[in-house]
């Protein structure tokens, strides 16, 4: 296991470059984000080769094309040298990504964000909030299936799920 802090910058840069080379699966984004390099900035890194896991701590910023994640801690899990899960924790953690070139960025925040790269699903846990195309979802748990365009939300008593859906403008509807 490696433990790196700001005091060991040369080794940190080398390890980050190595991790970046392995962390670009095609399922990482719907746009051309998957073809972009992943850039990760943090104060500390713990890389556990046997556990196939890298944990970044301290003002973590993850960028890959339009994908942006900001959190206090981010754990990246690998299988066969490919990223399979990204777990962001914060108060809150933030996620933003442009899913289609003609749409606004999807924005999300929660105490915990789990991005399943293979399934293209995002789980938001704890004071979860998701905004896309003006539609707004709030709850204790939000599961967003990006591929299917499906949102499942749950909340605990006494809180309820809150949702605001924007109507389609007549100018947005294509006549056939």
Q: Where are the predicted features?
A:
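Mature-chain termini and adjacent capping regions
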Residues: 1-176
């Amino acid at each position: 296991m490696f433990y790196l802090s700001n005091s060991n910058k040369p080794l940190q840069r080398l390890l980050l470059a190595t991790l970046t080379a392995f962390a670009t699966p095609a399922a990482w984004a719907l746009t051309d984000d998957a073809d972009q390099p992943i850039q990760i900035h943090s104060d500390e890194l713990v890389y556990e080769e046997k556990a196939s896991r890298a944990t970044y701590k301290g003002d973590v910023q993850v960028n890959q094309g339009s994908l942006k994640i900001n959190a206090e801690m981010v754990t990246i899990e690998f299988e066969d040298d490919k990223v399979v899960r990204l777990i962001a924790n914060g108060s809150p953690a933030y996620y933003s990504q442009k899913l289609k070139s003609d749409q606004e960025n999807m924005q999300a925040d929660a105490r915990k964000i789990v991005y399943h790269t293979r399934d293209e699903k995002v789980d938001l846990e704890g004071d979860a909030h998701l905004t896309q195309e003006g539609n707004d979802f709030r709850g204790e748990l939000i599961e967003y299936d990006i591929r299917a365009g499906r949102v499942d939300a749950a909340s605990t008593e006494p809180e309820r799920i809150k949702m605001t859906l924007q109507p389609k403008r007549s100018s947005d509807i294509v006549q056939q």
